[in-house]
């Protein structure tokens, strides 16, 4: 079950990293192997919009929108844990695995953003602040996700002023 939880969290990181939106993430539409399956109304983000879903039947509630996929992955892992509980009668180890999903996703998403932004060696706290600010800004400007991150790779280090990503201890 731990492997299923890890693979699901890793899959959600991969989807989010590239802007993939599954569209229908019911428990029967996710693989315990961490594979993308049964993606009927799937799509790819163009403008960075965490609220976007390609599923027109989900347009009202937007349960399966881009920005909600990690939470739905967690929900699905917890549903599997509930089903396994009926077989083992010991909820504690199952709950610990369900709880580990969020940390696994958070660490993977942090690594993915650090890679995309070229900030792998930056101070972790400051790097997360920069990434969070960027993710807040991108939807405001209707920025094409793929083009934006691809263009970052074209910037030469010597073309930009040095940015201090260390934590300011004076505040």
Labelled PLM ranges:
Residues 27-28, 32:
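Catalytic-loop Lys-Pro-X-Asn motif of eukaryotic-like protein kinases
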């Amino acid at each position: 079950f731990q492997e299923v939880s890890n693979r699901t969290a890793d899959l959600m990181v991969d989807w989010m990293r590239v802007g993939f939106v599954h569209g229908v993430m019911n428990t029967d539409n996710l693989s315990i192997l961490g594979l993308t399956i049964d993606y009927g109304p799937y799509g790819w983000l163009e403008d960075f919009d965490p609220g976007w879903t390609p599923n027109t039947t989900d347009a009202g509630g937007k349960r399966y929108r881009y920005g909600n996929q990690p939470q739905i992955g967690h929900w699905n892992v917890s549903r599997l844990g509930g089903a396994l509980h009926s077989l083992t009668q010991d909820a504690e180890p199952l709950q610990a695995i369900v709880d580990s999903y969020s940390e696994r996703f958070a660490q993977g998403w942090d690594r993915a953003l650090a890679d995309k932004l070229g900030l792998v060696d930056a101070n972790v706290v400051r790097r997360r602040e920069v990434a969070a600010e960027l993710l807040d800004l991108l939807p405001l400007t209707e920025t094409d996700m793929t083009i934006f991150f691809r263009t970052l790779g074209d910037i030469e280090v010597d073309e930009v002023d040095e940015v201090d990503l260390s934590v300011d201890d004076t505040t």
